[in-house]
Amino acid sequence: MSLYATQDEKKQAAAKAALKHLPKGGILGVGTGSTVNFLIDLLPELQLEAAVASSQATADRLKKLGIEVVDMNHVGSLDAYVDGADEIDRHMHMIKGGGAALTREKIVASIAKKFVCIVDDSKWVDQLGRDFPLPVEVIPMARSAVARKLVSLGGDPVYREGVVTDNGNVILDVFNLNILNAIDLEKTINNIPGVVTNGIFALNPATIAIVATNDGIEERTAQ
């Protein structure tokens, strides 16, 4: 029997458990997505100096709670970055980008001293990419050319119709990739001309994962 009646209750529990890993009174990097939204609603407890948002949607939600949102260009580093994941494995490698904010998420995470990932256990996987397609942000004019390159890597790219990123680009969701070496594949895809970035977060993995399971909260680090 689960401690939680719904998946949303798991997400809320993970968000609450993450608070102790986040700085009080500092500047926090904040990700995007349904789990992060539960966390944002708790952030007033931390009395943050400010936040750097990874998307316009996150910025809007933070501002509604009275939390100042600052431009990343005015911040040298962040004490922590907190975000969810579409998938995460035992190496703390992740697939992100279901909400199409992967590029800004990756940029904000890159200046943080630690990356706190909050998920429910449905996102914990043995191998990335088996169940969730890999999002790739692409400059619009390069969509077809990039898609052909992704096919040559063994993937099955699908254009995410009707979605434009905050950066004005499009998303290709790549199915059936065999992600055995996440670091190498992240580099390979990012080197395709026209790719802005892809949703593998392996070069800059999570520091700790806060995982809500049926039995409660687990804190996991790389194995």
From Swiss-Prot:
UniProt pathway: Carbohydrate degradation; pentose phosphate pathway; D-ribose 5-phosphate from D-ribulose 5-phosphate (non-oxidative stage): step 1/1
InterPro entries: NagB/RpiA_transferase-like (IPR037171), Ribose5P_isomerase_typA_subgr (IPR020672), Ribose5P_isomerase_type_A (IPR004788)
Family note: Belongs to the ribose 5-phosphate isomerase family.
Active site residues of this protein: 105 (proton acceptor)
Isomerase keyword on record: yes
Complex and partners: Homodimer.
Entry-linked PANTHER family: RIBOSE-5-PHOSPHATE ISOMERASE (PTHR11934:SF0)
Any single GO CC term annotated in Swiss-Prot or TrEMBL for this entry: cytosol
GO terms assigned for molecular function: ribose-5-phosphate isomerase activity
Entry superkingdom: Bacteria
Swiss-Prot/TrEMBL GO biological process terms: D-ribose metabolic process; pentose-phosphate shunt, non-oxidative branch
Catalytic activity: aldehydo-D-ribose 5-phosphate = D-ribulose 5-phosphate
NCBIfam families (UniProt xref): PRK00702.1, rpiA
Lineage: Bacteria, Pseudomonadati, Pseudomonadota, Gammaproteobacteria, Moraxellales
Protein name: Ribose-5-phosphate isomerase A
Annotated binding of substrate, by residue: 32-35, 83-86, 96-99, 123
Keyword Nucleotide-binding: no
Organism: Acinetobacter baumannii (strain AYE)
Role noted for this protein: Catalyzes the reversible conversion of ribose-5-phosphate to ribulose 5-phosphate.
EC identifiers of the protein: 5.3.1.6
Keywords: Isomerase
SUPFAM superfamilies referenced in this protein's UniProt entry, alphabetically: D-ribose-5-phosphate isomerase (RpiA), lid domain, NagB/RpiA/CoA transferase-like
GN (gene name): rpiA
Top EC class, one word: isomerase
